Amino acid sequence: MNYFSLYLKGLICFCLLFITMDSHALSIDKGYRQNKIKDLALIYQGGVHRIDWTSDQFLPYVVHQFADGHKDWLFDGFLFLEFTDGKGCGFATRYSDKNARKKEWLWLLDRLFEDGKALSALDRCIGTQIKEIGKPDFTHQIVLCLPEVLPGQKDWGEVDGEPMDFSRQEDQVKATRWYIDELMKRFKQAKYKHLKLSGFYWLAEDVDFTKDLSVPLSKYIHSMNKTFCWIPYWQAKGYNQWKELGFDIAYQQPNHFFKASIPDKRLEEACQSAATLNMGMELEFDERALFDAKDSFYNRLVAYIDHFERQQAFRTSAMAYYSGNHAVLDMYKSTNPKDHEVMDRLANLIVSRRGKQKKESHQTKVIAHRGFWNTPGSAQNSLAALVKADSIGCYGSEFDVWLTADDELMLNHDGWHDGYSLEKTSSDVLRTLKLSNGE
């Protein structure tokens, strides 16, 4: 073999290796983004137009009480954010005619760390629930927002005796780093028993005004072993460049809930976009989701849950939850069973996402009736009420067990709509189940 042939063969091998490595790198970034915080609740707090966020108001966000009376832990992460002080000053663009200054930033800090409210109240609420239902197998994570340093602002104030001019990038970064340091210092001083500071949130929902700031701030945040997250609105400028912008995770906003004119197809498109761009997903609803609300958007919330299940978002994606000012609290207080029904459904999905299994000593009891699946030759047992089935990793849920034509035992975990999500399961386990009708 001559020298040219050897060279050509080596070049081809190198190219194939490069392509293989590049394809592998792409495959790693395919699919929904995952995160140590599985379910992140957005808490709008600080402005005078918000509720105080006392321990009682946090209760339905910390634990959920199901229809059968049992409680379980709900959200494992909480994002505290605010756009305006409610008195005329804004912490982000487009929310107020007047930009917040250092004075308002300090006021917002005081509100966040106020005793008996916000972080303090959340910590106490968790402590109270630990006494009632036991310690969770996770630590509640906290994400804190960073106000947007608005370009051109010159009246913000001083850092280390130097006036800040936000027409200069170095001053924008310096002021934000000061705020990060204040958040870190106060959180440490508070000595919360049940909260851990996970990272920070970029308040701007696009990069129209501050695109050059996220990378240097990301480096500073990472130097303290904290994470940096972002939730851009639907197809916001820069949403598809979130990694290049320095964020550890970005959540896709479908922005479907808010307008009845937006078709449900948006939810499918948002899920597919997130999976393509390796983003997490945000589930959105507000007080209009209550069944008895005027011009209720209840069905739009149901559509989110339906589509997120079908698109496997609940199964594999990190999730953020926008619930308006306090829609979860409103659902909790509602006297309409439909509101509790949809929250039971959502809470059951959240609990199951943690992969938590109940260790129960009681014997499995199943109420069932014999039915017939629409596939010819396949017998079916429809399990109408599974009380306890810790041996197969299910708890308090309903599902069907199918014996297919080729004697394969299958579980259907989808009882909420006409679609079916099938999983193979252990024949040995299922044959140990005793049905109350004697089968």
State what each model feature region is.
Residues 235, 249-263, 267-357:
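Substrate-binding cleft of secreted/luminal carbohydrate-active enzymes
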Residues 79-86, 143-150, 186-208:
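Active-site groove signature of glycoside hydrolases
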Residues 179, 203, 213, 218, ...:
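Extracellular glycoside hydrolase catalytic/binding regions
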Residues 78-79, 142-144, 198-202, 228-231, ...:
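Hydrophobic faces of well-ordered beta-strands that scaffold small-molecule active sites
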Residues 140-150, 163-179, 197-205, 221-239:
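Aromatic-lined carbohydrate-recognition surfaces of secreted/lumenal glycan-active proteins
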